[in-house]
Design a protein with these regions (language model features):
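Phosphate-binding loop that captures ATP/GTP phosphates
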Residues: 66-67, 72-118, 129
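Short glycine/serine/threonine-rich phosphate/pyrophosphate-binding segments
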Residues: 49-54, 77-80, 151-159
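Conserved catalytic-core segment of NTP-binding enzymes
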Residues: 145-146, 152-178
Length: 178
């Protein structure tokens, strides 16, 4: 038996020093209970992710499920516009409350937190990824049957952060015939 290097991922030994990989998943807000999480992704912009996210959420809501949308497209949020939401979400020391659509779908988006929705959001990847994590950990979602996450286009920091830190149950890939 050789000396332990504590690099368990490349070691074939089954010893008592073996450590489990670190779990990077974040816990949702303590007042949130989310049953299923579906991410809506694409390789490029303009293919209809936000529309697919909105329609899936609306259809699930019509079938009697409690639904929510986490708008992770921080630099191009469009979910509030799809549902006609305006104004700002309310928050206090307990957390942030998502806004509700006319039919009761819970929505959180950067557009519901900033003063002027026409101002561009020019943030670097780690800041944007941190905001998405905060949407998961700081928003009081309540009891939700299906949460749909509207992702930004591509495979950058935000999708990687979401897939590492949020326990996604399924992924829907939106494409266009080009």
């Amino acid at each position: 038996m050789s000396e332990c290097t504590h690099d368990c991922s490349s070691c074939g030994e089954n010893c008592s020093s073996r450590t489990q990989p670190q779990d990077l998943r974040e816990k949702p807000h303590p007042l949130s209970k989310i049953k299923k999480i579906i991410a809506v992704v694409s390789g490029k912009g303009g293919v209809g992710k936000s529309m697919v996210t909105s329609m899936l959420s609306a259809q699930s809501n019509r079938k009697g499920f409690s639904t929510a949308i986490l708008d992770a497209d921080i630099t191009g949020p469009s979910i509030p516009q799809v549902f006609g939401l305006s104004g700002q979400a309310y928050g206090d020391e307990n957390g942030i409350l998502p806004m509700k659509t006319e039919k009761g779908i819970s929505v959180i988006s950067l557009n519901l937190l900033i003063d002027n929705v026409t101002d561009p959001v020019i943030w670097r990847g780690p800041i944007i990824a941190g905001v998405v994590k905060q949407f998961w950990t700081d928003v009081i979602w309540g009891d939700v049957d299906y949460m749909f996450i509207d992702m930004p286009p591509g495979t950058g920091d935000v999708p990687l952060t979401v897939f590492q830190s949020i326990p996604v149950d399924g992924i829907i890939v939106v494409t266009s015939p080009q």
